[in-house]
C-alpha cells in the first residue's frame, strides 16, 4: 500500500506518530493492531466496490481495491466500538460511510446529472475546484472558522 507523504507529515504536525497497518483479514490480528492505536486515518485511494453496499457495479466505476475494502471494513467497526477518532479523506470518508451502513452514488454524472468534470480533477492535483461548507457548530467550523475550497478526484459520492 502506498501512502502519500503529506498524510504522514500532517499526522506528525498534529502530534501523532503515523503507523501503516498491513491489510490483514483475520479479526484477531486486526483487533491487536487497533488496540495499539489512538486514532484511525483512512486515506484516499480507489473506489469502494459497490457490492460492499448492496449494489451492482456500474460501467462508469473507477479502479477498486477489494483487499483494502475487506481490511478497512473489518477495522472501522472496531475503532468505532472503542470510541476512537476516525478521520476519512476521499476514499476514506466513502468507506467509513459504507462501514456505518451508508451507500454511495457510484457515478455523479450518470446517476445525478452533475458533470463529472466538476468532480474528477485533472492534473495538477490539489488545486481547489469546489466549495466545502462546514456545518454550523461542528468541529470543522470551530477549527477553520469559514467555509473553504477543496480538490476532488472521485466520481463516487456519499449518498
Residue ranges and their predicted role:
Residues 90:
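Conserved G/P- and acidic residue-centered "switch" motifs that form tight phosphate/ATP-binding loops
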Residues 1-87, 98-100, 105, 109-145, ...:
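N-terminal beta1-alpha1 cap of cysteine-dependent amidohydrolase-like domains
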